[in-house]
Amino acid sequence: MAELLPGYSPSFKKPSEILRLSRRRSRSEASKTGLSPFSPGDVIKRVPGLRPFSPGPNKGAGVKRRNPFASLENTVCSPVKRRAETVAEYGAASLEPRALSAVRPSCLGQDSPEPPQFNSVEDVIWGDPLAADADPLVKTESPEKPAPACEIPKGSVTFPADWSLKTRLLFTSSHSFSWADHLKAQEEAQGLVMQCRATAVNLPHSIQEPKLSTDLRCAFQQSLVHWIHPSLPWVQLFPRIGVDRKMAGKNTPWSQDESLQQVLMSEWALSFTSLYNLLKAKLCPYFYVCTYQFTVLFRAAGLAGSDVITAVMSPTTRGLREAMKNEGITFSQPLVEDDTGKKQKKPEAASQGDINPEKENGTAEADEASDESDEDESFSWLEEMGVEDKIKKPDSISIKLRKEKNEVKLDHKPESVVLVKGTNTFTLLNFLINCKSIVAAAGLQAGLPPTLLSPVAFRGATMHALKARSVNVKTRVNSGYKDQFSLEITGPIMPHSLHSLTMLLQSAQRGSFSAGLYTHEPTAVFNTPIHSQAVKEISADLQNCGLHPCTVEQLTQVNELGKLSLRHLEMTDYRYTWK
């Protein structure tokens, strides 16, 4: 082939000769510049994890490009090579491969980091120190890896107030609840006295041995106590809505005895009045009135962002609302007003609950007049056609029923919630005492007065305690089992009890637990905001209301849940998350 083609050289058959000529050329160039020659192979041996390049001298551009088809195993440094000693100093800066640019400061006698290490494919691609336009002193990082920012702790140090009544709480934690079992007689007695005297207990941030903490166990007993009227141990007094089946077979001697019913109602009226007087004096923060049809929540001034006494009633019917209007009770329906989306601003007196009945009646009459005129206009086309006598027009009664159809649709729904403010709450008190429809006339609850629930003692009240039970179970995790501890609380659980229990568990369970909350559905709407707009915080003088100062601080907040309620509560690292 060499003889047939002039200029053809079979030098490729002798690579050793080519390498010898390359080394000779390198030594000659180094001798001219006065630098000590070195072999690229020596650099490869001394640099840990550096893959050998293709043979040949450096020409012109200086550095051979990395083979893009090379195996990653030849490129990525192994953990053993990462711990190799740092590359020694090199004198030939002009002949130094750009792969050693990260160690150039050491050649200048300065402190430098360790040789570049590749931990992933992205580091090899984006962090390649051989990039032609890369600064030798700056490491290029992957654009897909943003700089790590300071992590903001999730959750909040507290949770919003939930004014709904709960029927069951289920706490779970990785730490045992054995400290809540088998209270000693002295601890139980001390807890009852602490509740009667409204003694506030401040526990440490974390308790190492909860079972040995007497203060914790006494405070736990204190948080379970509530007051109720009437007290009939063999009859379920909460909840009262939709529980007729559970009361089947119970002995109810008052159902057929009118004299006994009168005695029960007179005692109930005294207890109800006593509770309202305590509320007005800010010695009771709130209380509930539970009937077989609806539930009423009375709150003292300063709670839920209101500077006056408020009462929330749900669910209601059109007949009940009409009866309240006839008694002169001024009320509002927050959810109905929100749904209509009225653009006109209400006067300030209306926002405070002092609505002028004359103006309200005048507005209603004007609306009725306009509706009647609309009805007359809607039938004018019949007269034009001359058939007005042949077609039967709807009478005034049917027109009125059609107008009231929208009001009837709200009955027994959350949107039927009614809000009463200020002095109208006292009128509501008298209305409920004298209203016969709040007591069932027939059925299993016939003649039974409504249930009064309060966090503090009142006239005719009986002290009750929530039922607590701890259970230890093993849950399967991967290939083994893990201990899971739970604490179940049942009974009429009011807002102060929920907050008190979470404060205790925060210390006893070292800031790590979760809770499932089971809401009495008719009361979930009690979280409806009182004000349509945000209001300033109100300083509430409720130091003597019988609750812990931290609990009072939570209950004074403006409602944030709307017509919803808390279903799940979780604490992690002493911070709450909920849904």
UniProtKB/Swiss-Prot annotation:
Stored InterPro entries: Donson
GO cellular component, one term: replication fork
Record's keyword annotation contains Nuclease: no
Signal peptide: none
Keyword flag Cell division: yes
Region listing for Disordered, in residue ranges: 1-68, 331-379
GO biological process assignments: cell division; DNA damage checkpoint signaling; DNA replication; mitotic DNA replication checkpoint signaling; mitotic G2 DNA damage checkpoint signaling; nuclear DNA replication; replication fork processing
Domain of life according to the entry: Eukaryota
Keyword list, A-Z: Cell cycle, Cell division, Developmental protein, Nucleus
Biased composition (Acidic residues): 365-378
Cellular compartments annotated: Nucleus
Compositionally biased tracts (Basic and acidic residues): 339-348
Function statement: Replisome component that maintains genome stability by protecting stalled or damaged replication forks. After the induction of replication stress, required for the stabilization of stalled replication forks, the efficient activation of the intra-S-phase and G/2M cell-cycle checkpoints and the maintenance of genome stability.
Protein family (similarity comment): Belongs to the DONSON family.
Subunit organization: Component of the replisome complex.
The protein, known as: Protein downstream neighbor of son homolog
